[in-house]
Amino acid sequence: MIKNIVLSSGVMRGYSYVGVLKSLTKNNLLNDYENILGCSIGSIFSLLFVLKYTAEELEAIIPKIDTNIFRDIDYTKIIEFPSTYGLCDINKIIKVVDILIKAKTKNKDITFKELYDMTDKNLIIVSTCLNKWKSV
């Protein structure tokens, strides 16, 4: 039994999480976990795991997503990084995530509590406060 799953950051690593999902499913381990923790792209895939997206669904969806939204870095924002909270346009990412959430829950604004009540899985998202340089 797996109690915790941790998915880390790195856009290219995100593609490998489809393989992780396949392996967990094949070995009947996906229903047993209690907590899933993600950071950056890992947080998006953690959400998709909790929403019960299958590897086959993700293999069909991912090629349709303009993955440049995860690599579309405006390097002129480096100086503004602490106030803009990132180098990518978060609004483009939010649009994609909203569609994926709504497809499974019918509610793009679902709360963590509602998601837990629906799935019995704890979704934990980790990020760093750039002003205080600590995890939040």
Cite the ranges covered by each PLM segment.
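Patatin-like phospholipase
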Residues: 2-104, 135-136
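Short, Lys/Arg-enriched, disordered terminal segments
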Residues: 1-2, 114
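Active-site gating loop/helix substructures
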Residues: 118-136
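Short, structural beta-strand-to-alpha-helix junction motif
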Residues: 100, 104-119
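A generic local structural motif
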Residues: 23-25, 109-112, 124
